[in-house]
Swiss-Prot record:
Residues 20-145 form the CMP/dCMP-type deaminase domain. It comes from the Eukaryota. Belongs to the cytidine and deoxycytidylate deaminase family. ADAT2 subfamily. The gene is ADAT2. The keyword rRNA processing does not apply. HAMAP family: tRNA_aden_deaminase. Its cofactor is Zn(2+). The active site is at residue 73. The lineage of its organism: Eukaryota, Metazoa, Chordata, Craniata, Vertebrata. Keywords: Hydrolase, Metal-binding, tRNA processing, Zinc. It comes from Homo sapiens (Human). Probably participates in deamination of adenosine-34 to inosine in many tRNAs. It is an enzyme of class 3 (hydrolase). This is tRNA-specific adenosine deaminase 2.
Length: 191
C-alpha cells in the first residue's frame, strides 16, 4: 500500500488529517469501490468525513439509475445534504469542514460540484486521465475561476495502484447495460 504524508491544513485552515485517518477512510472508500464493481458500475467509491464522522458516502450508480450524473461524489453530496437536514446543521458549515476521500480523481463535473460546495480537501487514489478535474485534464480544484466556490487542496496517489487494478477489472468485463452499437465485438477464436 502506498502511504502519503499527512496532509497540511487547507489554505483556509479548515481541516487537516493524519496518515492514520487517511488510511482508515481510504480503506472504506475502497470497499465502496469494490461494491460498485460487484454491481457492474465503474469502481469509484468515496466518503465525506466531517468531525471524524462519515456524513456521506457513495459509489457510482450510473448504470443502476441510468443517470450519467450519479457519480460517487454526487451521491455522497446528496447524502450530506440529507444528513444536514436531519441534524439541523448548516450545509455550508458542514461542507467547509468536510474532507472527501475518493478512490479516483474526481471528474470535471464532480470537481466543479466540490468547489461550489467549498470542500477544502480531497484525498484521492489514481488519476483520471480522461475526465480528471483535479489536474489530469483540467484543474478545477485550483484554477482562478471567479464566482465558482472556493479552490480546494488535493492529495493524489493514495492507494493508486489498487484503484487502477479495480478499474482494469471493470473495463475487461462486458457492460450489460451498454447499447448494442457500443458493445465490444469479441474476436473469433480459431481452433
Amino acid at each position: 500500500m502506498e502511504a502519503k504524508a499527512a496532509p497540511k491544513p487547507a489554505a483556509s485552515g479548515a481541516c487537516s488529517v493524519s496518515a492514520e485517518e487517511t488510511e482508515k477512510w481510504m480503506e472504506e472508500a475502497m470497499h465502496m469501490a469494490k461494491e460498485a464493481l460487484e454491481n457492474t458500475e465503474v469502481p469509484v467509491g468515496c466518503l465525506m468525513v466531517y468531525n471524524n464522522e462519515v456524513v456521506g458516502k457513495g459509489r457510482n450508480e450510473v448504470n443502476q439509475t441510468k443517470n450519467a450524473t450519479r457519480h460517487a461524489e454526487m451521491v455522497a453530496i446528496d447524502q450530506v445534504l440529507d444528513w444536514c437536514r436531519q441534524s439541523g446543521k448548516s450545509p455550508s458549515e458542514v461542507f467547509e469542514h468536510t474532507v472527501l476521500y475518493v478512490t479516483v480523481e474526481p471528474c470535471i463535473m464532480c470537481a466543479a460540484a466540490l468547489r461550489l460546495m467549498k470542500i477544502p480537501l480531497v484525498v484521492y487514489g489514481c488519476q483520471n486521465e480522461r475526465f480528471g478535474g483535479c489536474g489530469s485534464v483540467l484543474n478545477i480544484a485550483s484554477a482562478d475561476l471567479p464566482n465558482t466556490g472556493r479552490p480546494f487542496q488535493c492529495i493524489p496517489g493514495y492507494r493508486a495502484e489498487e484503484a487502477v487494478e479495480m478499474l482494469k477489472t471493470f473495463y475487461k468485463q462486458e457492460n450489460p447495460n451498454a447499447p448494442k452499437s457500443k458493445v465490444r465485438k469479441k474476436e473469433c477464436q480459431k481452433s
